[in-house]
């Protein structure tokens, strides 16, 4: 058997020759700019960071001075005195989307705030007024008093994001000051519990997952792409310690855009389109029962008589697979796709029935008062 080590000798000689020739080849071209020498996010940060703000919210709450005030035993037998006003402070981040002072942040950052102060990256500060807030989406829009010609971020098309894309998270974690962290898009179409304090436990959101470090104080801050555009609003993390474990979630920019558009139009509440249907994901067992080649999509279990899906010809047992070309594999995804289109929009919905496939246009109408987008009727 021929020894393998002998074949290394001519290879080493060839490598030595290449090494001697390399400097001469390298001198033939001078790098055009610093980006060709070393990877740096500095140009992205310079473009995006001025539009990311710190938000200081103050609430006046009623509290009793006694340490036993919240104990039901003591409060039953003893007079623990009157309540006194106490100040609660909250810290978060926000993103300027319009030069005249339109800022988007999380609902839980400004919920029940009596006073809001917004500080820009250049240390200018403004009083803020909430013009639209939604507990379920955990979004709020603030107007800065007397603001003009402010730096603003453009919205990215969050549907164009891909797992593995580089992203930056910008915010004010723990109040230490504006901080930038980097990571990638770890997952898309991630469903999980959504909403600010008091939101229904059953409320499911649709998020972009990232491993960029996100900590308390980053809430409402920016997740930006390498073009310096807003890809999402950082909203929550999964953590046992309260600090970053590399699992953060952002509300996609396409949903943020629909929300801000309604705020700028003067809406007093965020209006969602109403599907008037009850659906469930199609898993492997259900796919076999329905005669489908693979799991995926959502099956319609029931329709309201006035549902826009019923008007478009859908029936119980139909399987919705795509909305505007995007896969729909659960109620949260369907909810998201319809919400992004908004009331008055038209959804192109692909579906299966008895082995046949078709596409139908569904004209979306506003949800009845008190109705969730994927409920059969108001309050159901």
What are these language model-derived features?
Residues 10-19:
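Bacterial N-terminal signal peptides
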Residues 1-5:
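N-terminal secretory signal peptides that target proteins for export/translocation
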Residues 324:
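ABC transporter nucleotide-binding domain catalytic core, centered on the Walker B motif
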Residues 26-296, 301-306, 310-312, 331-345, ...:
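Serine-dependent protease modules
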Residues 360-362:
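Edge beta-strands of extracellular beta-sandwich domains
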Residues 21-23:
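N-terminal signal peptide c-region/cleavage motif recognized by signal peptidases
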Residues 317:
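Conserved catalytic motifs of ABC-family nucleotide-binding domains
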């Amino acid at each position: 058997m021929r020894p393998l080590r002998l074949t290394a000798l001519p290879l080493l000689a060839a490598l030595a020759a290449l090494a001697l020739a390399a400097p001469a080849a390298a001198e033939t071209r001078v790098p055009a700019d610093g980006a060709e020498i070393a990877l740096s996010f500095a140009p992205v940060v310079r473009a995006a960071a001025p539009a990311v703000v710190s938000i200081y919210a103050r609430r006046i709450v009623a509290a009793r001075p006694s340490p036993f005030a919240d104990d039901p035993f003591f409060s039953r037998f003893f007079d623990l005195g009157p309540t006194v006003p106490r100040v609660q402070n909250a810290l978060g981040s926000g993103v300027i989307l319009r030069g005249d002072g339109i800022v988007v942040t999380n609902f839980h950052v400004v919920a029940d705030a009596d006073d809001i102060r917004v500080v820009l990256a250049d240390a200018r500060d403004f009083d803020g007024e909430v013009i639209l807030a939604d507990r379920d989406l955990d979004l709020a829009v603030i107007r800065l008093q007397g603001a003009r010609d402010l730096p603003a971020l453009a919205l990215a098309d969050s549907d164009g994001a891909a797992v593995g894309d580089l992203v930056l998270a910008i915010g004010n974690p723990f109040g230490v000051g504006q901080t930038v962290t980097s990571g990638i898009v770890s997952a898309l179409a991630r469903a999980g519990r959504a909403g600010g304090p008091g939101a229904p436990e059953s409320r499911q959101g649709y998020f972009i997952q990232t491993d960029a470090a996100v900590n308390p104080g980053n809430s409402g801050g920016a997740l930006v792409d390498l073009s310096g555009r807003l890809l999402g609003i950082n909203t929550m993390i999964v953590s046992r310690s309260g600090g970053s474990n590399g699992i953060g979630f952002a509300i996609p920019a396409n949903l943020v855009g629909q929300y801000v558009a309604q705020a700028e139009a003067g809406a007093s509440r965020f209006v969602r389109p109403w599907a008037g249907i009850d659906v469930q994901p199609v898993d492997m067992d259900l796919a076999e029962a329905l005669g489908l080649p693979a799991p995926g999509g959502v099956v319609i279990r029931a329709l309201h008589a006035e549902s826009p899906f019923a008007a478009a010809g859908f029936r119980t047992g139909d399987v919705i697979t795509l909305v505007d070309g995007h896969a729909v594999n659960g109620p949260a995804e369907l909810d998201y796709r319809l919400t992004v289109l908004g009331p008055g929009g038209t959804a192109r919905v692909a579906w299966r029935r008895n082995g046949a496939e078709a596409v139908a246009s569904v004209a979306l109408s506003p949800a009845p008062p008190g109705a969730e987008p994927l409920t059969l009727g108001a309050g159901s």
